[in-house]
């Protein structure tokens, strides 16, 4: 009972600290492709999170290059030796910041439907390809809601800097794909309360051993948005998964 009350208090405080959510207006999907997914044997789809917009998908949120999904796609493509086509996909409206929209799941649910449709199109165009989907930040929640509906060509799901997946264990995602979790030691999402009450918060930390996911070595990653930095074990680990390592 004491634990439940502490979680309730945490949820109430979290909501009290957040402004009202801004309206979602995803518009047309914005996609950046590095390599040719129509010809590649392996394809990666990157799903970005909080603060990503069509205007900053190339330059990065706040003008910070490592936050750019397009830049991240280029780093992963290079780390894979050019053997993998990498797509930065922005087909939903991420929360603009750590606000009420970010602690709720409506945008992730809507985004999951769009993501599922996009990945199915990729699989239909290239049925023999192996696909990996990587969700960063709130994008990991989009991935979680899409997991059970993704095509069989999706062999691996990777979540980075996740605020939670709205489930208590990996098996609840109802997918045959392998689930990998990476979280940098100084990623602020590690401090998020493991709360999901009245539709607020995203629940258990998927990086905990009890969750049942595979641990991804992200040594060298910096903060919440440094998972694709060149020369890091983190980027090497992502490339290994994309190339089919077990």
Regions found by a protein language model. Name each.
Residues 134-143:
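Gly/Ala-rich beta-loop-alpha elbow adjacent to hydrolase catalytic centers
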């Amino acid at each position: 009972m004491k634990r439940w009350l502490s979680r309730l208090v945490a949820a109430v405080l979290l909501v009290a600290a957040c402004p009202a959510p801004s309206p979602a207006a995803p518009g047309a999907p914005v996609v950046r492709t590095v390599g040719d997914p129509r010809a590649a044997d392996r394809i990666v789809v990157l799903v970005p999170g909080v603060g990503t917009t069509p205007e900053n998908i190339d330059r990065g949120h706040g003008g910070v290059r490592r936050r750019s999904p397009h830049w991240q796609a280029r780093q992963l493509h290079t780390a894979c030796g050019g053997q993998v086509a990498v797509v930065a996909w922005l087909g939903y409206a991420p929360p603009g910041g750590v606000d009420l929209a970010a602690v709720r799941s409506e945008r992730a649910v809507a985004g999951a439907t769009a993501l599922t449709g996009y990945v199915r199109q990729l699989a239909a165009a290239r049925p023999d390809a192996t696909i990996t989907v990587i969700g960063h930040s709130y994008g990991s929640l989009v991935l979680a809601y899409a997991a059970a509906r993704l095509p069989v060509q999706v062999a691996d799901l990777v979540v980075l800097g996740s605020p939670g997946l709205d489930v208590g264990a990996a098996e609840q995602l109802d997918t045959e794909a392998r689930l990998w979790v990476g979280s940098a030691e100084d990623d602020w999402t590690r401090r998020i309360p493991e709360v999901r009450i009245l539709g607020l918060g995203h629940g258990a930390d998927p990086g905990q051993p009890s969750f049942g996911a595979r641990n991804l070595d992200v040594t060298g990653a910096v903060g919440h948005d440094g998972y694709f930095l060149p020369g890091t074990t983190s980027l090497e680990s992502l490339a290994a998964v994309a190339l089919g390592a077990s």
